[in-house]
Curated annotation (Swiss-Prot):
Transmembrane segments: none annotated. The modification Pyrrolidone carboxylic acid is found at Q20. The gene is Amyrel. GO terms for cellular component: extracellular region. It is found in: Secreted. The record marks D309 as: Transition state stabilizer. Its EC number is 3.2.1.1. One of its GO terms (biological process) is carbohydrate metabolic process. This is Alpha-amylase-related protein. InterPro entries: A-amylase/branching_C, A-amylase_C, Alpha_amylase, Glyco_hydro_13_cat_dom, Glyco_hydro_b, Glycoside_hydrolase_SF. GO terms for molecular function: alpha-amylase activity; metal ion binding. The keyword Magnesium does not apply. It is an enzyme of class 3 (hydrolase).
Length: 493
């Protein structure tokens, strides 16, 4: 009997963790966008007017629970929680619930960035949060939950990143480190996440997951409610989990400890794709992209060119400030069948602490748009760049096909097909790509969705005529505005 019970327990745990890799997308949609620091009302409108019609699968939203108010309102104040009340600069609980409902109604899922590792760092005396709650972070007193000092690990600094104890039980940049092995802490975290599930979210990005023991997270995840069927989720659906685990391959705490609990953020993907498109590694080597580069299995990897943290760091990672290379890297990211894809939607920044666009009263301002639909007034909105949203459509059109017909020039010009549904070519050399290439597409004329769109039966940008053998003449000049060309069956004239 004991063996049978143990077997059933293990099977249940295994099935739950497998289910937590499912992002619950509608139809053929398969790209998440991180609308960093957007207000809930603006996200709701964006789901209805842009993301839904353009085929985006979901939105990662900024932390939803009450945080400290820091001088100047830097973005990182959202990562310093003081209670689980759903009031932030993005809006209140009613506005959040309205956003989730409206986005789900148009097939765009919501994934919340959640903070399970810690509460706010040191601030002297009593602080007041975004919902009006008082706390004394230095004393580890958070009555809005409530948490007291006994709910936290003893205060210590992380000085040795090769010491598992320090990484998982000391304070990450001074943030008060919760004890997730505590029954009380577990109950409050589960209560918080279950409330979000009740409101209709599809899952969670778990911040700082490597700083929590995987067995504690497994307990928390397995204790969560199923997703809310009133928001269109099938019965017994589990929340999608993707966990922030920074692992460069030599970490004491490994991504492998978390990959069976849910997807894991594949930071090596971000670093290597940046290296390649900055010219530090020839694009020809991308033919083996994915597990051949030491990355996680595709279904366990949350992939991205940049995120809200590493886009602010020096190094190989690309961001919106290198637009030509960034668009090429994003096109490759969305065209190559590896990982669970997320694209970034940023605001402009000059330094690490730059706050989101705000008014004189330090309230986040809504994005405004020009006549082409691009964002202005401090918002970058990469997801509204044609070269990026068109590749979201490309990724939808070619879903469930494999890479075929790889070609390269032995250097930084490459092309490949996605079955007989799509074709991508990239030129990252300082000379033109001019070549008859196998597009693998049926005979016909196709619009390049990077340089333009298919509107009323004609192309506003480049077009390529494909012959009966699937070949077409591909030209990408070294001085072209974009170094990439993309064709797919849904953009056939």
């Amino acid at each position: 009997m004991f063996k049978l019970a143990l077997t059933l327990t293990l099977c249940l745990a295994g099935s739950l963790s497998l289910a937590q890799h499912n992002p619950h997308w509608w139809g053929n949609r398969n790209t998440i966008v991180h609308l960093f620091e957007w207000k809930w009302s603006d996200i709701a409108q964006e789901c209805e007017s842009f993301l839904g019609p353009r085929g985006f699968a979901g939105v990662q939203v900024s932390p939803v629970n009450e945080n400290i108010i820091a001088a100047g309102r830097p973005w990182w104040e959202r990562y310093q929680p003081i209670s689980y009340k759903l009031t932030t600069r993005s809006g209140n609980e009613e506005e959040f619930g309205d956003m989730v409902r409206r986005c789900n109604d148009v097939g765009v899922r919501i994934y919340v960035d959640v903070l399970l590792n810690h509460m706010s760092g040191d601030f002297d005396g009593v602080v007041v949060g975004t919902a009006g709650t008082e706390a004394e972070p230095r004393e580890k007193s958070f009555p809005g939950v409530p948490y007291t000092a006994q709910d936290f690990h003893p205060t210590c600094e992380i000085t040795d990143w090769n010491d598992r104890f320090q990484v998982q039980q000391c304070e990450l940049v001074g943030l008060k480190d919760l004890d997730q092995s505590s029954d009380w802490v577990r109950s409050k975290l589960i209560e918080f996440l279950d409330h979000l599930i009740e409101l209709g979210v599809a899952g969670f990005r778990v911040d700082a997951a490597k700083h929590m023991a995987s067995e504690d997270l497994e307990y928390i995840y397995s204790s969560l409610s199923n997703l809310n069927i009133d928001h269109g989720f099938p019965h017994n659906s589990r929340p999608f989990i993707f966990q922030e685990v920074i692992d460069h391959g030599h970490e004491t705490v490994s991504r492998d400890e978390y990959k069976d609990l849910g997807a894991v953020t594949e930071f090596r993907f971000s670093e290597e794709i940046g290296n390649a498109f900055r010219g530090n590694n020839a694009l020809k080597w991308l033919q083996s992209w994915g597990t051949g580069w030491g990355f996680l299995p595709s279904g366990q990897a949350l992939t991205f060119v940049d995120n809200h943290d590493n886009q602010r760091d020096a190094g190989a990672v690309l961001n919106y400030k290198s637009p030509k290379q960034y668009k090429m890297a994003t096109a490759f990211h969305l065209a190559y069948p590896y990982g669970i894809s997320r694209v970034m939607s940023s605001f402009a920044f000059d330094d690490h602490d730059t706050p989101p666009p705000q008014d004189a009263q330090e309230r986040i301002v809504s994005p405004e748009f020009d006549e082409d639909g691009a964002c202005v007034n401090g918002w970058i909105c990469e997801h509204r760049w044609r070269q990026i949203y068109a590749m979201v459509g490309f990724k939808n059109a070619v879903r469930d096909t494999e890479v075929t017909g790889w070609w390269d020039n032995g250097d930084n010009q490459i092309s490949f097909c996605r079955g007989n549904k799509g074709f991508l070519a990239i030129n990252n050399n300082l000379y033109d790509l001019s070549q008859d290439l196998n597009t693998c597409l049926p005979e016909g004329t196709y619009c390049d969705v990077i340089s333009g769109s298919l509107i009323d039966g004609s192309c506003t940008g480049k077009s390529v005529t494909v012959n009966e053998y699937g070949f077409g003449y591909i030209h990408i000049g070294s001085d072209d505005f974009d170094g990439v060309l993309a064709l797919h069956v849904d953009a056939r004239v």
